[in-house]
C-alpha cells in the first residue's frame, strides 16, 4: 500500500477553518476592528487620480481605450497601454454611482480587497482564527507604507487565490486546477501584476516537479517531507492548465502588446535605478525598519517553532524574500506569501507558551482577556483621528486635501482664474495623477504612468529629473516642451530658479506651491 502523502484528497474547503469566525469573542472583535482600522486609508496614493480619470473616460467612451496618451502634452503620440484598464473602469463605476460618497466607496473597495487578500492568504494555514487574525494585523502594520488605493492590491488578491488553488491541488483536488483559466483571464485585465502570478505558478510547479523527481529516485524521502506531494498525473494536469491560463492572458484589449509594454518597462534600467519603489530595501526608512523587524520576528518564531520539511514552500519564500530585498515594491508580495507561515508560527508559539506556563495561569479565558485588553489599548492609542481623516477623504475630499501636500488650493485658484495661466503646464511627478483628477480639462507634463516612456530622443522622465531635481535646474527643458506655465513646490530649486528668471512671473503662491507664467518676449 502506498504511503505517499499525495494520494488521499482532502475536503474542498477554504483552509481548515471557515472563511469567517464561527463565534466572535471580544478578542476576535477587537482584532477585526484593528485590521479594519489599518485597511481603511485616505485617498493619498499619487497614481489614484490618473486611474480614476482613465476609468471615467472609459465609461464615457463605451469601454474604448485610447490608442495614444490622451492626458499629457509632452508624450501625446505614445501608444499607451493601460494594464489595469478594467480596474480603472470598476473604480470609476463605484465613484460615479455613489455620487458624493463616491470617494468613500473607492476607499471601502480597496479595504475589502486588502482584507480579502489577507484572509484568503491565511486560509491554508494550520492555525486557529486568533493566530490568523494576529498575523494579518501584524502584516498590515508592516505594510502601512503600501496601503491605500493602489491597484497593486488586486494582484495581491490574485496571488492569494492562486495559493489557495495550489493548496487544494497539493491535497488531491484535480479539477480545481482549471479555475486557473478564469483567474488569469480576469487578472490580466485587472492588473499587469498577473505576470507575478505566472511566475509564482512557475516556481510552485518547478519546485514540485523537482521534489517529485527526487522522491522518484529515493522513495524513502517521501516520509520525511511534511507537505503533500502532487503525483505525476496531477502535475501534468497542472502544467496543461497553467499553459491554458497563460494563453488566456492574451485576451485583453492589447494582446501581445501588454507583454511587450511590461517587458519594456521592467527592462528600463534608468527607471529601475531612479524610482524609489524599484530600489533595494533600506533601513533608512520607517517602512524598511518595520519590514526587517517582521523578518527578524518571523525568524525567531521559526527557530523555536518550525520543524517541518516543506521544499515547495521554501522555494516560494526564498525567491520572494530575495525579490523583496532587491526591490522595495515586492515587499507586499512576500508579506502575502509568508502570511500562512506567520499564522502557523504564532499558533505554535501560543501552544508552546501554554505548555510551559504554570497551571494556575493557563486559563484560556484569562489570556484572551489580557490579549483583548492589549488590542483595545492599541486601538485607544491610535485614537479616532485616522478614521476621521478617512471619512473626510471619502466624503469631503477637497477639504481633506487641504491637510495634505497636494495643491488643492492652487487647483481652486486655477479654476477661478483660468485666463491667467497658459496652455502647456509643467507639473511635478507626484502631482500628475492628482491634477488629472481635479483638473480634467488640463493636459499634464508627467505622471506615474510615464517613467519608461520615450519617443526618439525625447525621454520625458529623464528630462523631468533634469529640470526638477538637478541643481541648477535645466530650464531649457521648459523651452523644449514649449511649457508656458509651471505649478511647482514653493521654495524648491526650480521655484528659486524661476524667481530669478526674467522670462517668468509668479502669479500665485501659497504655503505649498507657486504658479509661474512665461512672459511674452
Describe each region flagged by the PLM.
Residues 59-62, 192-307:
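Transmembrane catalytic cores of multi-pass membrane glycosyltransferases
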Residues 74-101:
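Short hydrophobic/aromatic helix or loop-helix immediately within or flanking a transmembrane segment
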Residues 108-125:
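Transmembrane-helix motifs of polytopic, lipid-linked glycan transferases
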Residues 162-177, 295-305:
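Membrane-interface transmembrane helices that cradle and orient dolichyl/undecaprenyl
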Residues 168-185, 236-240, 313-318:
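Short hydrophobic alpha-helices at membrane interfaces in multi-pass membrane enzymes
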Residues 357-416, 430-432, 450, 465-470:
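Membrane-proximal, lumen/periplasm-facing interface regions of secretory-pathway glyco-
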Residues 415-455, 483-490, 516:
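Short periplasmic/luminal acceptor-recognition loop of GT-C membrane glycosyltransferases, typified by
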